[in-house]
Amino acid sequence: MNTEATHDQNEAQTTGVRLRNAREQLGLSQQAVAERLCLKVSTVRDIEEDKAPSDLASTFLRGYIRSYARLVHVPEEELLPGLEKQAPLRAAKVAPMQSFSLGKRRKKRDGWLMSFTWLVLFVVVGLTGAWWWQNHKAQQEEITTMADQSTAELNADKDSGQSVPLDTGAVTSQDTTPAQTAPAPATPVDSTAATQTPAPTAAATQNTVVAPSQANVDTAATSAAPAATETPSALPTSQAGVAAPAADPNALVMNFTADCWLEVTDATGKKLFSGMQRKDGNLNLTGQAPYKLKIGAPAAVQIQYQGKPVDLSRFIRTNQVARLTLNAEPTPAQ
């Protein structure tokens, strides 16, 4: 009878009351229980008052109660009915799973989007490559055309230049004929001298006659000598005329670091140069400004105009045929 009464009394007591009574029998405080179970004092107080904290899951609360029961030597089997009431197990909320067809449809859409992106990228790259190739091909064709034109002009200049030696030869032949015919008047003097040898007076006459011929020969020689001496003096004048364009403020100086085709035209439309220049070549041109230049390889030439370098970097970066006009800058008054 006493055992049944004790069992009924234990069932009447709640889980929190039984744990508090057992703690008090062992002489433990709530602080001591909280330190041993590594819990907050407020959590121990809520368990003894049969409160379920809102921020604590029921699974953790059941675990704390079981640890508390083992600490105060209360059988867990006796607390199970009270645990079901105080901390009932709650069904976990599970998010509804997306169907496989939805994920497959989204994956298919992403695949189409990726394929379209790659297609656009390939089209852009292809158009860029085609544009570059067309420009490069057009430049090469233009350079080839200009080179062919310059070759034809050089051949025409060579054909027309063959008649020049004939003219100079005619001039030299005309210049030499007077020198060759000049001694001819001396022959009658010699013949007359040969016929008049028997008479002494003739000998005197011979002497008197020969002397003027010799004088004429001497004067011809002396007159020819200044002419011969004057011809070298004319050379510095011609050389000065050749060197004069270098001192011209409108002179155009070009140095070549590689083979390059170019064409230079002055303000009158005269072509100062049109053709191919080889590596390490120099070119000095003088004409009427402004100059119009067409250069096949801008990176292979360095240009100076009026003592200042000409900037060709914009043509070198784009790798294009350079077409530019050089205007004359006014020189400061002396």
From Swiss-Prot:
InterPro entries: Bact_Cytoskel_RodZ, Cro/C1-type_HTH, Lambda_DNA-bd_dom_sf, RodZ, RodZ-like_C. Residues 155-241 are annotated as: Disordered. The chain crosses the membrane at residues 112-132. Residues 133-334 are periplasmic. PROSITE patterns: HTH_CROC1. Residues 176-211, 219-241 have a biased composition (Low complexity). Residues 1-111 are cytoplasmic. Residues 30-49 bind DNA. It holds the Pfam family HTH_25. GO terms for biological process: regulation of cell shape. GO terms for molecular function: DNA binding. The helix-turn-helix (HTH) motif in the cytoplasmic domain of the N-terminus is involved in the formation of spirals to maintain the rigid rod shape. As this protein is anchored in the cytoplasmic membrane, the HTH motif may contribute to protein-protein interactions to form the RodZ helix, which is localized beneath the cytoplasmic membrane. The C-terminal domain may be critical for determination of the rod shape by probably interacting with enzymes required for synthesis of the peptidoglycan layer, including PBPs in the periplasm. Cytoskeletal protein that is involved in cell-shape control through regulation of the length of the long axis. This is Cytoskeleton protein RodZ. It comes from Salmonella dublin (strain CT_02021853).
